[in-house]
Amino acid sequence: CQHGCIYCDARSKCYQMNHRFEDIEVKENASELLENALKRKRRKCMIGTGAMSDPYIPLEKELKLTRRCLEIIDRYGFGVTVQTKSASVMRDIDLFTKINDKSKAVLQMTLTTADESLCRIIEPNVSVTKERFETLKAFHENGIPSVVWFSPFLPFINDTKENIDGLLKYCIDAKVRGIICFGIGLTLRDGDREYFYSRLDKHFPNMKERYIYTYGNSYQLTSSNNNLLMNRISEVCRNHGIMFGVENVFSYLHKFESKAEQLSLFDRI
């Protein structure tokens, strides 16, 4: 991935990459493979992307692989949900609108910090949070629902009520459908731990030592503010009608909807 997020789990050795993380493997025939798969599907479903590598890295502007895949999804009448940190997804809002008119399209956007200067440090090659917020608003204005991921919250850095409230305000103003948050903290494994600590040494003096003292070699680094902040997120979501809870939001993301079937049902009524 080209985003350079200092906390990225995909750097972990468990994924057995045999090249530099910053070197991009391009699946040039992605749209052809997708089309062949969709042709064989007996039932329509939701197609998702963005779990391991962002579909809107800077290289996508040139390659247009994601756009070609969206065109295939639209052609065959499937639904789609993409997870990204990039405002570049705006380029394809026309296709998301077409897909959503016939079935269901959902934008998933990750937000980590309401502090733009901090955002540029921990996510150096990504659209800043304000740009992501504007993207969420634009999708809502075009009738396309969105889900926001709150992840990760780095202990002693962005695991504060002030930050959470700033992100929640963005979500309320953008009228997001749901929020996913597994907890306040992050995970570190062999491979990404070393890179993360090297970035802490560069940008946050003495922070690595604080992490090692507090968490040792743990995989799960849970913030001491976890319960307080998770309750805060839950309370605000409940008060503003925002879906919250991993099971509920995932169920919504996975559920395929056909506008044509809905219309025919109403026609019969």
Task: Specify the residue positions occupied by each region the protein language model found.
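Auxiliary Fe-S-binding modules of radical SAM enzymes
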Residues: 162-269
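Alpha-helix N-cap and loop-to-helix initiation/capping positions
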Residues: 22-26, 61, 123-131, 159-163, ...
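A structural motif
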Residues: 77-78, 144, 176
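Short, electropositive alpha-helical surface patch
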Residues: 63-64, 97-109, 158-175, 200-203
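Conserved Radical SAM active-site core
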Residues: 2-108, 112-120, 129-133, 138
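Alpha-helix-loop-beta-strand connector modules within alpha/beta enzyme cores
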Residues: 71, 133-142, 225-231, 235-237
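Conserved strand-turn element in the central/C-terminal portion of the radical SAM core barrel
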Residues: 114-116, 123-125, 138-160, 183-186
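Acidic-and-aromatic substrate-binding clefts and catalytic sites of carbohydrate-active enzymes
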Residues: 26, 88-90, 155-158, 187
